[in-house]
């Protein structure tokens, strides 16, 4: 008896963009290096909680600390032909607006089961970061909802990077997407566990 292939999850991490090379070099000069990195919900936790019915693919996107949309688009498209018939897309932070932009401007070869945009910025009105590098969204985002059976956007009221007001901006552009606002996800979803998304992903296949 043949076994069903796993549902692929293509998970796009966050990143940063800078207006100038000088700003980027200044960031590199002053960034704090941590040898012991905190555990993130999208890493081993997600793999362990979802189990063998899912296979998580985590591309290392080009130059994540000085990201350019055009670079990410090329690299992302290399993965699309490799995905199984059933697949889910997750974008975290900059990865979220990357998916929002890509899916609003391009039709996928095959429809995703679900798309999860976790704390995605909508525009450049951020607390202390620039949003440049070609990630600006166009006015019409309707194609996002045509590219997936389910679209979820997740925000936190205590997010200190992407203000929760960005949830309403997306709400005005999307008709059927489910927008979820949590009271607290330790700021910019800096949590080691995320049981809500695990339950939702498992529910996508029911």
Mark where each language-model region is.
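Short alpha-helix in the alpha/beta-hydrolase fold that links the catalytic acid
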Residues: 163-172
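Short beta-strand/loop motif that positions the catalytic acidic residue
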Residues: 147, 152-155, 159
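Conserved hydrolase catalytic core segment
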Residues: 101-114, 123
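Catalytic histidine-centered segment of alpha/beta-hydrolase-like enzymes
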Residues: 185-196
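Acidic catalytic loop of the alpha/beta-hydrolase fold
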Residues: 124, 157-162, 187
């Amino acid at each position: 008896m043949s076994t069903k292939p796993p549902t692929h999850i293509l998970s796009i991490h966050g990143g940063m963009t800078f207006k100038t090379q000088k700003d980027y070099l200044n960031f590199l000069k002053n960034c704090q290096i941590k040898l012991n990195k905190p555990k993130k919900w999208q890493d081993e936790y997600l793999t362990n909680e979802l189990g063998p019915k899912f296979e998580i693919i985590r591309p290392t996107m080009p130059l994540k600390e000085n990201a350019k949309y055009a670079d990410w688009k090329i690299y992302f498209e290399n993965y699309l032909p490799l995905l199984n018939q059933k697949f889910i897309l997750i974008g975290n932070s900059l990865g979220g607006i990357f998916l929002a932009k890509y899916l609003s401007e391009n039709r996928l070869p095959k429809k995703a089961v679900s798309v999860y945009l976790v704390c995605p910025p909508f525009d450049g009105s951020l607390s202390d970061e620039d949003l440049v590098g070609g990630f600006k969204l166009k006015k019409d985002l309707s194609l996002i909802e045509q590219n997936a059976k389910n679209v979820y956007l997740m925000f936190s009221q205590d997010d200190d990077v992407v203000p929760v007001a960005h949830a309403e901006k997306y709400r005005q552009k999307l008709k059927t997407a489910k927008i979820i606002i949590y009271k607290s996800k330790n700021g910019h979803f800096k949590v080691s566990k995320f049981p809500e998304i695990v339950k939702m992903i498992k529910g996508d296949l029911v």
